[in-house]
Regions:
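Predominantly a Rossmann-like dinucleotide-binding segment in NAD(P)-dependent oxidoreductases
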Residues: 56, 167-173, 178-278, 286-288, ...
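A structured beta-alpha segment of the ubiquitous adenosine-cofactor-binding alpha/beta core
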Residues: 99-117, 121
Length: 415
């Protein structure tokens, strides 16, 4: 399932995020606040906290803002969300001055007109490229939620914003939790060093129950109301990118990370087996062909109950790497790696990314290495989605040349 914060979750890990579990899971992580170089922060003095503007104040935005505050090196000073109730609830929780709470589709621009050192972007994915580009243009460091975009033009935009950020000596970090995990990192390093031999094929799955329960209720109340549709963005194909991009990207990202490649082409299918609201599908099946004729089968569903898992496996001539979002990460074969269990990955990964963002800003590191692989994984989901929608084989080059743009229905929403 997916909780209202966008957390990828299964029956095994529902309800795990609470204060006690979070503190226990992250107690080994400690940060010492370094002296902040004055030139890296605008309108602040050395040793002061990084001034954050939050764009997107829903459940996930509020949750991750709390992690930024707990880090100790940040202060939330401004907030923007389309909805007044959300930005006010957020502002009260984090003591954001009422004059620095902005609403409407263009509220983020007013936020950036003020003095913020960095922006955290947690709104519907359709808006991510626009918000990220505006942040970089305004001279702010950018912390961007996945997925980075819903379509090819959006991915190109974020890729360009990442390059522009580096040129302007700004940090730009994409918040994929899996890539921060020590077990995942060690397993991927071993595979790329040849521990399972030549990879022949693989599989990636995202099998969960139905999510977005609150959004379903919102949309069911009045499906034609534009503000209801915006609140229920996870059920809207253009606002979310559909489940293969918005949710399933967690599994796809691990596959592209292990193979360190983009697919050549893909064949797919899927549909709506249970959903009755919105226009997103609830299941996808895709066969990706990567360089060297490596075949990776992908399957996802967000419906029903029963067995569920978020995993990626790669099969080599000398072994198998097996990774699970909430379970075992290991290698079996001639050169085994016992690995272990990826613990509380959703929270711990975000905490590590928040720490990395702070350390990169304060140390003046602007390589922004998370952007290119995030673009690659996002485009890989779009390739699978395109192939599934058209029920045929689609090449990477064909997808990029088509440059298809998703356009949501924003009529009736306030600017």
């Amino acid at each position: 399932m997916t909780d209202e914060a966008g957390k990828p979750s299964t029956n095994r890990d529902r309800g795990q995020i609470n204060r006690r579990h979070f503190l226990a899971g992250t107690g080994a992580l400690a940060w010492s606040l370094t002296v902040v170089k004055p030139e890296l922060l605008r309108g602040t003095q050395a040793n002061s906290r990084i001034a954050l503007g939050m764009i997107g104040c829903g459940v996930r935005g509020t949750w991750i803002a709390d992690l930024f505050v707990k880090h100790g090196g940040y202060e939330v000073v401004a907030a923007a969300d389309y909805f007044q109730d959300r930005v006010d609830a957020f502002g009260e929780k984090f003591r954001v001055d009422s004059a620095r709470r902005y609403t409407g589709l263009s509220g983020y621009r007013k936020l950036l007109d003020g003095k913020v050192d960095a922006v955290v972007i947690e709104g519907p994915p359709y808006f991510h490229p626009e918000h990220a580009a505006a942040g970089v243009d305004a001279g702010a460091h950018v912390f961007l939620a996945k997925p980075i975009a819903v379509d090819v033009p959006g991915c190109r935009s974020v890729e360009a914003s990442g390059r522009q950020a580096s040129a302007k000596k700004l940090c730009f970090l994409v918040d994929f939790q899996t890539r921060t995990d020590p077990l995942y990192r060690e397993a991927v390093k071993r595979v790329q060093n040849g521990d399972i031999g030549r990879i022949i094929c693989g599989e990636a799955t995202y099998i969960t129950g139905e999510g977005f329960g609150r959004q379903v209720s919102d949309l069911r109340a009045d499906p034609t109301n534009p503000e209801r549709r915006l609140r229920a963005w996870g059920l809207d194909r253009a606002l979310s990118g559909d489940v293969i991009t918005e949710q399933n990207i967690h599994a796809v990202d691990v596959a592209t990370w292990i193979l360190d490649a983009q697919p050549v082409h893909a064949y797919g299918d899927g549909g709506r087996g249970a959903r009755t609201l919105g226009d997103c599908w609830d299941h996808f099946s895709v066969i990706y062909t990567f360089p060297g004729d490596v075949l990776v089968t992908f399957c996802s569903k967000q419906l029903g109950e029963g067995w569920d898992d978020i995993l990626c496996r790669m099969y080599g001539v000398e072994g198998t790497v097996d990774t699970h979002y909430s379970e075992d990460v290991s290698i079996r074969g001639k050169t085994p790696f016992a690995g272990g269990k990826a613990t509380n990955l959703y929270a711990n990964g975000a905490v590590r990314n928040i720490a990395d963002f702070y350390n990169n800003i304060t140390a003046g590191r602007f390589a922004n290495e998370t952007v290119p692989p995030s673009v690659r994984s996002n485009l890989t989901t779009i390739l699978g989605r395109t192939a599934a929608y058209h029920h045929r084989d689609v090449t990477w080059d064909e997808m990029m040349k088509a440059d298809e743009r998703l356009v949501p229905k924003l009529e009736g929403l306030k600017a």
